[in-house]
Amino acid sequence: MARPLKEGLDYFPLDVDADYDDKFQLIETLHGPTGFAIMIKLFMKIYSQNFYYKWTETEQILFAKRVNVDINTLKTVVNDCIKYDLFDNNLFSEFQILTSLGVQERYFTAIGRRKKQIVVLEYLLLDRPEVINLCPKIVFANINVVNDDINAEQEELMPALSAQTKGKESKVNESKAVVSEQEKLPEKIVKEKPTTTAYKFWEENVAITGLSEFDRELLKKLISLGGNELTVHAMKKAIELNRRRMKTVDTVLRGWLDNGVKTTAEADEQEKNWNGGAKKNARAEPAKQEIKISDQYNFGATRTD
């Protein structure tokens, strides 16, 4: 049986002037030395585990005990860390994990050319090519998919995904632990994320040869504005309009956000209301040309070619 995969780091880099960083200073100003100490302890915990750390009620209780801090104080400090972008808000809201772009850059730089390393795509803030460049033998996986055709090498890696929540188990039971953890995944995640990330959705349905650098940067901004799920919904709308460009996704998503849309259900309702209004106006003024859905997004004149 292969030796269990080591995912964490033994040490991590910390700038000597880290306490002068604006984000650090905000937390220290709000919460004093206790807040600063909690931040450092959190980074230690994250790097010792992976490039992220699960932050559910269980981890909060145990962490509060380890650092000898009242749990309410701990929650307040961590919430402010998320609020002021020390940790990514979108990934915390969706997956209850603590991570950031800086953490991921330092982590993947540190592990370098490890023989094998498995990475959950949904947890990544870095672009996939960046990760592969730093770690050529990386193995990507989806959080809510168990592939029946995983080869023997990957089967040895998969138990590492559940290490934080299941703890140490005998090597004999490692393969069973993978199935058990996948079955315990929250039903909400399974229902809401059947297609993985916005990047993968666009590549599979539109940009078959991959995203351009411009589109990739724009998509990053869109996900930070509307979140992964709403961005994918805007992609589907762009495809429905037969305007398969990232700028179209940008226009659709920003149009929703400008009207206070926060969920896919609200987006559908917005589209329904707009379409209903367009049809009503068309009946009241039959002499006018019927309004097309593209007008809502200011695409300009309809092409005839």
Swiss-Prot record:
Span list, region Disordered: 267-287
InterPro entries given in the database record: DnaD-like_sf, DnaD_dom, Lin1244/Lin1753-like_N
Annotated family: Belongs to the DnaB/DnaD family.
Protein name: Uncharacterized phage-related protein Lin1244/Lin1753
Organism per entry: Listeria innocua serovar 6a (strain ATCC BAA-680 / CLIP 11262)
Taxonomic lineage of the native organism: Bacteria, Bacillati, Bacillota, Bacilli, Bacillales
